[in-house]
Amino acid sequence: MRLILLGPPGAGKGTQAQRIVEKHGIPQLSTGDMLRAAVNAGTEVGKRAKAVMDAGKLVSDEIVIAIVSERIDQPDCANGFILDGFPRTLVQADATEAMLKAKGLDLSVVIEFRVDDEELVRRVDGRYTCAQCGTVYHDTDKVPVEEGVCDKCGSTHFKRRPDDNAETMIKRLEVYYKETSPLIGYYHAKGKLRPVDGMAEIDQVTAEVEAILSKL
């Protein structure tokens, strides 16, 4: 089960990825996490990435693909994985396809989360997380059962990301539509794309996702 979750920021990809992890036992792969792990582990590609970052430059697609490739070779990915927030561009999508093909692998499905822009801005504008465990909350949609106490770990410390506001969100959407939304057509043409209604209640979205996964 090799998945890509596609959709704009705030569409609910992270929430659904976590549910897939819990139910199916496959890892969620974030490029940021993989990059940090490779650098900390001192792998060959990690050293290359560190040199680039230390110089204050952006890590190239080639290095990112190499890090993803290295991570996919780990034993916990034997039964599949979820690519979260990657690929972001058509160039990265082509490189990912080629990398998987070289391993004799193929993507199982690309799940696209469809949500209106207005709703995305509303969601992100009220979002905050537990500083301890990262559980996501929202000012109106999802507040802790006990005010000021995380449902999952009991922490009383919460934080808001500086970029979780309407102005920044609108800019992030512009980047998404310019760079990432072309992937919708790309994967549709390959017969891999499966859309879900990201406007629905979280449990309903999960049901739609599971219906897709049950057919793999």
From Swiss-Prot:
Residues that bind AMP: 31, 36, 57-59, 85-88, 92, 160, 172
Gene Ontology biological-process annotations: AMP salvage
Protein's UniProt name: Adenylate kinase
Keywords tagged on the record: ATP-binding, Cytoplasm, Kinase, Metal-binding, Nucleotide biosynthesis, Nucleotide-binding, Transferase, Zinc
Record keyword Metal-binding present: yes
Phylogenetic classification of the source organism: Bacteria, Pseudomonadati, Pseudomonadota, Alphaproteobacteria, Hyphomicrobiales
Its EC number(s): 2.7.4.3
Gene Ontology molecular function terms on file: adenylate kinase activity; ATP binding; zinc ion binding
Cellular compartments per GO CC: cytoplasm
Amino-acid positions noted as binding ATP in the UniProt annotation, renumbered to this chain: 10-15, 127, 136-137, 200
UniProt-annotated stretches for the region NMP: 30-59
Protein's gene: adk
Pathway note: Purine metabolism; AMP biosynthesis via salvage pathway; AMP from ADP: step 1/1
Top-level EC class as recorded in UniProt: transferase
